[in-house]
């Protein structure tokens, strides 16, 4: 029987090794073998279980309830994403940056990035914009904490093999969201360099040998599609990022 290291499994399944360790230690979802040196060893059955765990989480099930679902056929609901959103709002109302950072770090270890961004962070950011009882300071504090964590994650991912790319916001004023998308891309094998300010035109001729990833926050306009096609015909590596 073939066995795989935690690094091999993380790359194959698209899951951060820290998340795999949390699934094992905190939630009892995985039971890998151990080498003589004490290192985790996973087999094909473990990998299948990881994929099943990912499917449950993608369906909106909180990681703490996945173990029971692996042993039964019942399914949770989206209510737990709402619970996490409410928890984040409560922390923000405390105006405690240290507690906010700590919770963002812990969530990053427990849930896949895509699910956190789509079901927790983006909904909370939207609620902060719409909630007239929430000061702009809270929204700014939340964005600052997210950018800080995303930047740290980008740095950590550079220690692993990956492809270099430059990410830029194309005519969209969403700095915090840009960093969230950089974080999302980094866990797909990219070493991302972020251009912090919005760009009116990507100017790929300035980066002739590099890969550019452009993000617009919405579907590209007709003109943007024309430019993307033109740049491709010119031999430039310009990728449109649509999360």
UniProtKB/Swiss-Prot annotation:
Any one Gene Ontology molecular-function term assigned to this protein's record: DNA-binding transcription factor activity
Annotated knockout phenotype: 3- to 20-fold derepression of several genes coding for small proteins including the ycgZ-ymgA-ariR-ymgC operon. While the BluR/F system is induced at low temperatures under blue light irradiation, it is not essential for growth under these conditions. When both lon and bluR are disrupted, levels of OmpF decrease, leading to lower drug susceptibility, with a greater effect at 26 degrees than at 37 degrees Celsius. The mechanism is not yet understood.
InterPro entries the UniProt entry points to: DNA-bd_dom_put_sf (IPR009061), MerR-type_HTH_dom (IPR000551), MerR_fam (IPR047057), MlrA-like_C (IPR053987), MlrA-like_helical (IPR053988)
Keyword terms of this UniProt record: DNA-binding, Repressor, Transcription, Transcription regulation
HTH merR-type domain: residues covered: 3-72
Domain of life according to the entry: Bacteria
GO BP terms: negative regulation of DNA-templated transcription; regulation of DNA-templated transcription
Pfam hit, one: MerR_1
DNA-binding region, residue range(s): 6-25
Stated induction or repression of this protein's expression: Expression is strongly activated (7-fold at 16 degrees Celsius compared to 37 degrees) at low temperature.
Keyword hit for Repressor: yes
Residues spanning the membrane: none
Subunit note: Interacts with BluF.
PANTHER family: HTH-TYPE TRANSCRIPTIONAL REGULATOR MLRA-RELATED, REDOX-CYCLING DRUG-SENSING TRANSCRIPTIONAL ACTIVATOR SOXR
General function of this protein: Controls the expression of several small proteins that may play a role in biofilm maturation. Binds to and represses the operator of the ycgZ-ymgA-ariR-ymgC operon and also regulates ynaK. Binding is antagonized by BluF upon blue light (470 nm) irradiation. Blue light may increase the affinity of BluF for BluR, allowing it to be released from its operator.
Record's protein name: HTH-type transcriptional repressor BluR
Species of the source: Escherichia coli (strain K12)
């Amino acid at each position: 029987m073939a066995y795989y290291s935690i690094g091999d499994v993380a790359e194959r399944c698209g899951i951060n090794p820290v998340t795999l360790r949390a699934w094992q230690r905190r939630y009892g979802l995985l039971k890998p073998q151990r080498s003589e040196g004490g290192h985790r060893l996973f087999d094909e059955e473990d990998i299948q279980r990881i994929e099943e765990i990912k499917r449950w989480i993608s369906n909106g099930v909180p990681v703490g309830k996945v173990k029971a679902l692996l042993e039964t056929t019942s399914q949770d609901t989206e209510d737990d994403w709402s619970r996490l959103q409410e928890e984040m709002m409560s922390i923000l109302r405390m105006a405690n940056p240290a507690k906010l950072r700590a919770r963002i770090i812990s969530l990053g270890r427990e849930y896949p990035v895509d699910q956190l961004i789509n079901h927790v962070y983006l909904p909370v950011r939207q609620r902060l914009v719409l909630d007239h009882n929430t000061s702009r300071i809270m929204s700014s504090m939340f964005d600052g904490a997210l950018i800080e964590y995303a930047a740290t994650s980008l740095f950590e991912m550079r220690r692993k093999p990956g492809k270099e790319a430059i990410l830029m916001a194309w005519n969209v004023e969403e700095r915090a969201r840009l960093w969230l998308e950089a974080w999302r891309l980094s866990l797909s094998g990219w070493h991302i360099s972020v251009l912090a300010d919005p760009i009116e035109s990507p100017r790929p001729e300035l980066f002739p040998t590099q890969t550019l990833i452009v993000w617009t926050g919405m579907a590209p306009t007709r003109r943007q599609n024309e430019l993307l096609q033109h740049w491709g015909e010119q031999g430039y590596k310009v990728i449109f990022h649509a999360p």
